[in-house]
From Swiss-Prot:
GO molecular function, one term: tetrahydromethanopterin S-methyltransferase activity
Protein name in the entry: Tetrahydromethanopterin S-methyltransferase subunit A 1
Keywords for this protein: Cell membrane, Cobalt, Membrane, Methanogenesis, Methyltransferase, One-carbon metabolism, Transferase, Translocase, Transmembrane, Transmembrane helix
Associated pathway: One-carbon metabolism; methanogenesis from CO(2); methyl-coenzyme M from 5,10-methylene-5,6,7,8-tetrahydromethanopterin: step 2/2
Stored HAMAP family: MtrA (MF_01093)
Chemical reaction(s) catalysed: 5-methyl-5,6,7,8-tetrahydromethanopterin + coenzyme M + 2 Na(+)(in) = 5,6,7,8-tetrahydromethanopterin + methyl-coenzyme M + 2 Na(+)(out)
Principal EC category: translocase
Effect ascribed to mutating H94K: No change in cofactor binding
Function: Part of a complex that catalyzes the formation of methyl-coenzyme M and tetrahydromethanopterin from coenzyme M and methyl-tetrahydromethanopterin. This is an energy-conserving, sodium-ion translocating step.
Length: 238
């Protein structure tokens, strides 16, 4: 039988719109924009609930996950959150972390993907403790339950370190308490395209500098060749 540990006292440590199951289960699920949190819990998940924003919403989720070392799998299921692109932001955070200065999630395509209330050690713990299971845009109950049970069968046991407790400013319900304005899908798409354009401009600039250097080298070579030819011609005439 795999080893289990006690979650933080009073777990879950952050209030939210979720359902709690067996705290010793190795599985947690975020249902993103969908309210189907009962499905994972019925299949044996420790906790399940929506996560609608790519900043404070993710921070609250992480605080509840790393404060229970028994949770080793995070299933991303339900409809992706339009504009915020929360599911993809969670994957990017787990894979890439955040920029140490700007605190933005590296590689996230959401509108405001910033993690300001979770320190680096909390993000690192999230990355090490959890394995991400991608079922984004899947709402089929049978598929979700099957994946929960599959993860339970692969339970590696509790994470080697004890529960990590991080305080996150709650500010009420996620939809109302976060200082995040709803972002239309069109706006998020424009912002994502702007970021892509900026990247392409930087690449073009680098390419231009490279070709400029090559051109400068060619001109320099031609001038040296002409000077050598003229010098040789003068010497022959003399």
């Amino acid at each position: 039988m795999v080893e289990k540990k006690s979650p933080a006292e009073g777990w879950p440590v952050v209030n939210g719109d979720y359902i709690v199951g067996d705290p010793e289960s190795p599985v947690a699920a975020t249902t993103l924009a969908s309210h189907i949190e009962d499905i994972p819990v019925e299949a044996g998940a420790a906790i399940a609930g929506p996560c609608k924003t790519e900043n404070l919403g993710i921070e609250k989720m992480i605080a509840n996950l790393i404060s229970n070392p028994n949770i080793r799998f995070l299933i991303l299921c339900g409809s992706e959150v339009q504009g915020h692109i929360t599911g993809q932001s969670i994957e990017a955070l787990h894979q890439n972390g955040v920029d140490p200065d700007k605190r933005n999630i590296i590689g996230a395509t959401g509108a405001i993907p910033y993690i300001e209330n979770i320190p680096d050690e909390g993000i690192e713990r999230f990355q090490k403790q959890l394995e991400i299971v991608n079922l984004i845009d899947v709402e089929d109950a049978d598929a979700i339950k099957a994946k929960v049970k599959e993860c339970i069968e692969k339970d590696p046991g509790a994470f080697e370190e004890e529960a990590m407790i991080i305080k996150v400013e709650e500010g009420g319900e996620e939809e109302e308490g976060e200082e995040v304005k709803p972002v239309a899908p069109e706006t998020a798409l424009i912002e994502a395209r702007m970021r892509n354009i900026q990247t392409q401009v930087k690449m073009i600039g680098s390419t231009n500098r490279m070709f400029a250097g090559m051109y400068s080298g060619k001109v320099q070579g031609i001038m040296i060749g002409l000077a050598f030819t003229l010098t040789l011609g003068i010497l022959l005439l003399v």
